């Protein structure tokens, strides 16, 4: 969040961070309603499909408050801009990574998304991963399924992921998680069911828990979003709209993938930077 604060300060904007706190029962809808009631000049929202959130976005816009979604988009809402990664870009990148983890023992792949679409099979992400896997495997024998968890809250997501591992016959060989919350739930389920190393998790985002899981081999690889760009572009999108009444509808940010080796290298570099702050 430091990047967003710096970018905001450069634009003479006061940025207030509001988010889920384990010490409270507030969810994102609550924070949205608080921001609307406080008559914020603009709102930057990490959309997660929570019930009522899309209508809250529309309410904010109707009240003259511009809303910018980040990481996940509310495509049917009246939000002004989305800062993140396009489904096409994600599909291409994930397809390449998933294909690398396909081997002779791979029989089932499950893709978990939170996307505002009616048919998962029409998702660009699902389509591109499927195509990449079929090309890598050279056959149609691998079962690839997609599941949309958009309408689930945190508790429901945990239940849905846990249910996947309780059905032993249907446990996938590769589980693809397309958002932070689902990745965190999958990480915990893998530990609870003692399946580390048996199910390959392709995750999303780089929280401390997720990075630690990659280091330990619980998660095979995770998608790293350029948070510097994310912070800069989201503040830029809001301030541009406030100042000029217009902004780009989409700001694209870069991604890469971190496996165990990459995470360990990142840790070493962080320690070096702390020892030599002036270099």
Question: Over which residues does each language-model region extend?
Answer:
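Hinge/cleft segment of the Venus flytrap/periplasmic-binding protein
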Residues: 226-279
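Hydrophobic alpha-helical segments within soluble ligand-binding/sensing domains
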Residues: 83-109, 155-160, 206-210, 225-243
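Short beta-strand elements in bilobed, periplasmic/extracellular small-molecule ligand-binding domains
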Residues: 8-24, 108-111, 133-155
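Conserved acidic residues
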Residues: 41, 80, 107, 173-174, ...
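Alpha-helical recognition/docking segments in bacterial nutrient-uptake
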Residues: 1-89, 93
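Second-shell loop/turn segments in exported
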Residues: 21, 79-85, 115-120, 145-151, ...
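Hydrophobic alpha-helical
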Residues: 32-33, 37, 42-62, 67, ...
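Short, solvent-exposed amphipathic alpha-helices that sit
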Residues: 1-11, 90-94, 120-143, 156, ...
């Amino acid at each position: 969040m430091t990047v967003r604060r710096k970018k905001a300060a450069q634009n003479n904007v006061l940025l207030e961070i509001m988010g889920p706190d384990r010490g409270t029962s507030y969810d994102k809808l609550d924070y949205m309603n608080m921001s609307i009631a406080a008559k914020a000049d603009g709102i930057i929202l990490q959309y997660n499909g929570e019930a009522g959130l899309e209508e809250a976005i529309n309410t904010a816009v109707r009240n003259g408050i511009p809303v910018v979604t980040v990481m996940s988009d509310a495509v049917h809402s009246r939000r002004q801009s989305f800062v993140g990664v396009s489904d096409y870009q994600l599909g291409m990148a994930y397809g390449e990574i998933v294909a690398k983890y396909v081997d002779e023992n791979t029989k089932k792949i499950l893709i978990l998304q939170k996307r505002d679409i009616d048919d998962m099979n029409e998702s660009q992400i699902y389509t591109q991963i499927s195509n990449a896997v079929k090309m890598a495997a050279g056959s149609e024998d691998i079962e690839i399924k997609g599941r949309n968890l958009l309408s689930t809250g945190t508790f429901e997501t945990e239940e849905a992921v846990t249910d996947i591992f309780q059905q032993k016959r249907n446990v996938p060989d590769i589980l693809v998680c397309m958002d932070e919350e689902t990745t965190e739930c999958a990480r915990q389920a893998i530990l609870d069911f003692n399946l580390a190393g048996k199910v390959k998790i392709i995750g999303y985002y780089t929280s401390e828990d997720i990075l630690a899981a990659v280091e330990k081999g619980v998660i095979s690889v995770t998608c790293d979003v350029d948070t510097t760009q994310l912070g800069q572009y989201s503040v830029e999108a809001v301030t541009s709209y406030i100042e000029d009444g217009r902004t780009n509808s989409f700001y694209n940010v870069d991604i890469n993938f971190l496996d165990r080796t990459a995470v360990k290298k990142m840790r070493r570099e962080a320690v070096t930077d702390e020892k030599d702050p002036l270099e």
